[in-house]
Amino acid sequence: MSASINNVINVTLLEEGRAAARDNINVCAILTSQTGVLSTAERWRSYKSASAVEQDWGASSVTAAFANVFFGTSPNPVSAGGTLIVGYWNAAGETLPATSGVLRGGEISQAVVLPALREKSDWSFSIEIDGTKHDVTEINGMTATTLADVIAQIQAKITPDVASVVFDGSRIAITNKSTGTNSVVGYPTVLDGGSFIGDLLAVAEGSGASLVNGSASTEISPETQLESLSKLKAQVNVKGAAFIDKILDAQVPLIASWAKANAVIVYETFTGSAALEVDPTNPAWAVTLASQSNFRMLYSKTGNRKFGVSYMARTHTVNFNGERTAITLHLKTMNVPAESYEQTEIDKAKRVGLDIYTTIKDVPCVLSSGANDFVDNVYNLMAYVDAVQTDSFNLLKTTPIKVPQTYYGVDQLEDCVEKTTHGFVKAGVFNPGTWTLPDFFGDRDMFLRNIEQNGYYVLAGDLKDQSTADRQERKSPVVQVAVKNAGAVHSADIIINFNK
């Protein structure tokens, strides 16, 4: 035989590691207290269309009505790769029904088990259900064409009013028909006479099977709106959220603080004249005073809470990979009726930090207040921070070797941040301009020149200035970034000189 080429040439393939995806900034949640579909056991479902919501909740349900507003807003998050999450708020408490005892078999393959079953016609076992012994005999495997044929024979012996016997494609489950703490299913045992089938079907003790006893009905106490948000966020990474029900005044400061800490934008619609007042007892004004900009506040004179859902849907529509895709909500059209406001109400709403939906020259439009910052600033920066963090992580993660702790390695990290930031310049979030803050880092002239020419400046610290401890911990020098916001024109003063 000829000699192996490995005697001369050896090749090692260094594959690229799997990268992490950026957060989907356009995943939005509507939280409902409507029961019957979701519960504390199933807290959320995702939807891409209004019809899917109607199918689950009913066309005349309040949840479907709010979802129709969400999907009827154009564009909406689905058009930008997002989705609607309907989350559950356990507002009134919940009664969990009693459960049944169940025997869950180990995983089996029909292709492996069926040939063995066909060798005998006298399979048997004995099983106790609620303390009563049930003998299962004369299971004929020789006539079985599928495993379902054997399951049907077992079910005929253990009648359906006692327990159900089901094969789900990978394992067998025997579920007691009774419920409560006394609902018990035991492991199958060997029966005198016949061939024991328990091990072959992986339902015997020691075969990978497990027992779960039934439980009594359980009362679950009501939860706060903050608790429901927190539990939803733990299960699905929502970036926008709005409640169908009014957020209680006492919950507003708690949720506003939570939203900032958890990178979620919460949308709430206020109503009533008190919400327009500059008063510490006004929860909307208190949010503005605390600069809790992740809590977006809207005002509806008629108390139309669907305004918040449409506003959320219109906000979360940006694809930051595109060019000039960034938006402002000012003057945008919502999927709710516009309302009439006096100038005094408009001025008060603007001061407090409430956006309203009205008409100008019979054209419906949003009037935005920047008192608690503008929603696009919050949304854009949330996306940018995640992008920088994720892209920098991927630089370290995907290399099959390493990013060295050298000037070359630090330059790689610096270049990565610059590339990400440039993408947000392209999208219209940042833009070249004049730096108006007194703060700067590095060489001042270079700093200002980069801001004016590029809209950003990225600078990594010098390795020679790094502490021994950081060096030994394999940390990179600090990377600093300055970005110039592109902003948006919301109003203008025009002077006309007329010569007669």
Where is each model-derived feature located?
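Polar low-complexity, Ser/Thr/Gly/Ala/Asp/Asn-rich disordered segments used for subunit assembly
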Residues: 1-29, 34-123, 129-130, 139-305, ...
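Structured, hydrophobic secondary-structure cores that serve as assembly/anchoring elements
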Residues: 1-64, 68, 75-81, 367-500
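Short glycine-rich loop/turn motifs
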Residues: 122-124, 478-479
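Short strand-coil-strand connectors
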Residues: 128-132, 486
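Short, isolated positions in well-ordered beta-strands
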Residues: 134-136
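Short, surface-exposed charged micro-motifs
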Residues: 162-164, 348, 355, 480
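A glycine- and small-residue-enriched flexible loop/hinge signal that marks low-structured segments
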Residues: 229-401, 413, 432-456
